[in-house]
Amino acid sequence: MKLAKQHLDLGLFSNKRDEQLAFWQRTVGLPYDHMGKLGGGMQQHRHHMNGSILKMNHARDPLPALAPSGIVGVQIARDGLAGSQPLADPDGNKVTLVPKGHEGVEGIAILLRVNDAAAHDRFWTHAMQYERVSEGRYRCGDSLIVIAEHGPVERSAEWRGPGYRYTTVQVWDCIAEYEGILARGGSSGGAPRLLGDAVRFAFVCDPDGNHIEISQRASLTGGAL
């Protein structure tokens, strides 16, 4: 996989805009980037997170009461910490600030609960071409995907629900990477499409149905999409 950015992004959905913004900016201390309109009463509030982006997607209308995704937490590396600091956002999503380098976390680590660790190992190493750094730990750039818990994870027909719902990997060629992942055994979560002249994106799904956005941003790759 040819990366356009060496950091994974993480997306969540919430109906609690003001409370979430206060938490991520004041409690966690993430710098605010900007707000983008996604349509359908959805606004994306982007925050810098060690080169990654925390995407707090605020929904104007009530979100469907879906089962939680398999994304159960995020660890954020921070200089100057003596130990880990567990936190929870206003919807109960787990966040832990960790000393930089703790268990190999240099940027962020996205924590998963999985039904089948072997299926996830095949997916992350073969379909997604991430590097296995140790058992249940996979590196993409300076970000980690970590198998932290074992099942159960319930698939949902709809993916826009409360809590952590997807990760994003920024690539040079969305179509080529999407087709390559499917050819290597990944499953589609949404065919490539354009968002104006700024982004081409698609979705694939991990073995438990968690969505991964394959994003090609003109601001990172240059030129036309």
Segments from the language model and where they lie:
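Glyoxalase I/VOC metalloenzyme domain signal
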Residues: 1-34, 46-134, 138-190, 194, ...
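Conserved beta-strand edge residues that scaffold enzyme active sites
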Residues: 38-39, 195-196
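Short coil/loop residues immediately preceding or within conserved phosphate-binding loops
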Residues: 42, 199
